Amino acid sequence: MIIPVRCFTCGKVIGNKWDQYLDLLQLDYTEGDALDALQLVRYCCRRMLMTHVDLIEKLLNYNTLEKSDNS
């Protein structure tokens, strides 16, 4: 969904690093090098960025208020 604001394990703020992480990946950094550049050294924080799946854009396509006509 949306990147969590804090790491689930240690509580470090990581939500502000998501866009920078994606930018570094676009510049052909490896995942490890991008996380090193963002100064994320704890494996729990690294996990939060590496395993996040951004689904918010896909979910915005669905309108929960629409009723389907199943007659």
From Swiss-Prot:
Q: Where in the cell is it found?
A: Nucleus
Protein known as: DNA-directed RNA polymerases II, IV and V subunit 10
Q: Which gene encodes it?
A: NRPB10
SUPFAM superfamilies hit by this protein:
RNA polymerase subunit RPB10
Keyword Aminoacyl-tRNA synthetase listed: no
Supply the Gene3D superfamilies for this chain: Homeodomain-like
Which PROSITE patterns does the record match to this protein? Answer: RNA_POL_N_8KD
Q: What is the lineage of its organism?
A: Eukaryota, Viridiplantae, Streptophyta, Embryophyta, Tracheophyta
Q: Which domain of life is it from?
A: Eukaryota
Q: Where does Zn(2+) bind?
A: 7, 10, 44-45
